[in-house]
Amino acid sequence: MYVPETENDWLQIAKDFEIKWQFNHCLGAIDGKHVIIEKPPKSGTLYYNYKGTFSIVLLGIVNANYEFIYVNIGSNGSISDGGVFKHTTFHEKMKSNQLNLPSPSILPQSNVIAPYCFVADNAFAINENLLKPYPRRNLTHDQRIFNYRLSRARRIVENAFGILAERFRVLKRPIQINVHNVPKVVMASCTLHNYLRKKSSNYITRNCVDTEDTETCTFRPGDWRLNDNLVGLNRTERQRTADGNSVRQIFTEYFNNQGRVHFQERMINTMNI
């Protein structure tokens, strides 16, 4: 699995997100899932998660092509979901500027300078390099537009996890092996997912994933959603930062003005955002 190492690597990912999903300056979509395991002997509540099962956590970042560019596997299921990403080496390097992320630059067709960011859902804490949706209560029109535009990019990681579980069905039921070997099984699945994504045109079919028709403004959920067995992280309100809120406001204003797309007004109603 190749983790981007240079600024040019990251810029290529951002270009793909802009072209395919109309989200500028996006470096990847982040999400996490609980991989259900059989309770290890004498482990007490160490792996006991908020859903009442036993698990380890798979945290993943994907590019615009449904490929994993980073995974962290093995946090026990009882850990606070909001703390999973915070305790990864990736997060540590991001906060200490060791990832070679691109410097803030001007957004297309504007004079607005914005940083490059990852996108996630409400299980994660917003900051200057990680954007998440506005909470779904009393949203303004502009906030609904932002949430829709972010959802287009964020759904890529949801679909990557869904396809992963559909193709590697060991992830769809409690894994009954020594808990210390579970991360190896999960890593092998993620690595094979990337390989097959690159090598097989039939690995991901159109019906597998969520699809939008931006001309008719219709949405079709991916087939994996009919049998989604991976438990998501607990989506609770996380601490917000002033920098994170400011960056989100920059993108909100941009997507409602210079960066708007012709279908967004109809789609927020189609998708009830």
Q: What is each PLM-predicted segment?
A:
Residues 1-273:
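Short, polybasic Lys/Arg-rich linear motifs in disordered N-terminal/cytosolic regions
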